[in-house]
Amino acid sequence: MSKQKKSEIINRFRKRFDTKMTELGFTYQNIDLYQQAFSHSSFINDFNMNRLDHNERLEFLGDAVLELTVSRYLFDKHPNLPEGNLTKMRATIVCEPSLVIFANKIGLNEMILLGKGEEKTGGRTRPSLISDVFEAFIGALYLDQGLDIVWKFAEKVIFPHVEQNELLGVVDFKTQFQEYVHQQNKGDVTYNLIKEEGPAHHRLFTSEVILQGEAIAEGKGKTKKESEQRAAESAYKQLKQIK
């Protein structure tokens, strides 16, 4: 694609992002950080941009910032809950389905910068991709304005869902399966990535879940995390004989 086309797409993104931040009641300093947060690797590949200009590094950072923010929120809100309960609650809040809820609620999915092929194959509605962008956005917000602003964003976008019990239907199967195995004294659970296939912008991961040294289920997903969730879901339903 041409440089002119790239410039048009980026300028359109920047205008939409500026409008979105105004709607949310936030300002920003470094627009380049947010552009990177919304740049999927397929977009970078289509325009032959620097391979590190996609959002994966910011996603890595945002994941940690999000866990810290949610941990502090739960620690303050539930002073009498033990560590195990807090961990379970945090897992529900920061799991992929929850992040998709947060992102879609404020329309972040509409602004993702995708390559032509990824757009055609439904990348804009893919849960793993949306949740990754949400984490990358949190990473960019942290670098641009600090933890206090991340906290204010969470107060507006994340915590209300928690307080209104809107995440009760979200299932973190890895946590559920781990707890079930522990209750049944069935040993340790581990996950192995057994296959990774497809082009860089459209990867498919296959993971297996190991219990007592035996592979008992497999799962596929667009990310390693998603494939492990699907494997855990299959194993959990298999052991509990849920259809």
Curated annotation (Swiss-Prot):
RNase III domain residues: 10-146
Main subcellular location: cytoplasm
Enzyme Commission code(s) on record: 3.1.26.3
Assembly: Homodimer.
Binding residues annotated for Mg(2+), in chain numbering: 59, 132, 135
GO molecular function, one term: ribonuclease III activity
The keyword Metal-binding appears for this protein: yes
Extent of Basic and acidic residues compositional bias: 219-231
Family per similarity comment: Belongs to the ribonuclease III family.
GO term, biological process aspect, one: regulation of gene expression
Keyword Glycoprotein: no
Protein name: Ribonuclease 3
Gene that encodes the chain: rnc
Active site: 63, 135
PANTHER family: RIBONUCLEASE 3, RIBONUCLEASE III
Gene3D superfamilies in the record: 3.30.160.20, Ribonuclease III domain
Pfam (any one): dsrm
